[in-house]
C-alpha cells in the first residue's frame, strides 16, 4: 500500500509517514519503499510507562536513521481512554452522526488488505465483539485504478459511509483531539 500510494500520489502528498510504537524492526522491503518515496517514521516513545521497551525502540530508531529515513521520536506523557468496554452513549442516529463528524479521527489503519477508517474502533470491535463494521473498512486490494475508485478512497478518508457513523461510536469517548479521559502510558491494563 505504501508503494502504491507513493507511486501514484506521492507528488500530491506533503507529509508522508508511518506511525509505529517502535517494537518491530522494519523489513528491508519497508526500508526500501520508505527511501524511494521519502516516507518518514514517527516512533511513539512509551518508555516512561514501559521502560523495558527502551533498548528495542532505540534499535528501531537506529535502523531508520542509518538508512536515511527521516525519523521523529515522539514523547507521549499520556494516552486517552477510548472507553470501548465501559462507554454506552445511547446516541440517536443523528447524535451518532454528529459525534462521528465532530470526532473525525485521523487514525487510519491497514489490516488484511483493508483500510480502516478508525483503527481503534476496528481493533476494539474485533476484540470485544468478534465483529467488523462494514462502514469502517475499504477493501483496497481489489480496488481498480479508476476515477470512481479514487473518488471512493477519498470519500472514505473524509468519513463518508452509508450510516454516517461507526457502530463503535456508541462505545467511544472520541479521538485524542476531543477526548478528555486520560490514562498513563502503558498503564491501561494494570488489573490484568
Residues of each region from the PLM?
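Catalytic cores of alpha/beta
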Residues: 28-32
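A C-terminal junction/extension of Radical SAM enzymes
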Residues: 61-124
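C-terminal accessory region of radical SAM enzymes
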Residues: 68-81, 120-180
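Sequence contexts marking disulfide-bonded cysteines in secreted/extracellular proteins
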Residues: 102-108, 168-173, 190
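Short, electropositive alpha-helical surface patch
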Residues: 2-7, 97-100
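Short cysteine/histidine-rich metal-coordination sites, predominantly Zn2+-binding motifs
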Residues: 183-192
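Core AdoMet radical
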Residues: 1, 9-26, 38-77
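Extracellular/mature segments of secreted proteins
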Residues: 110-112, 177-182
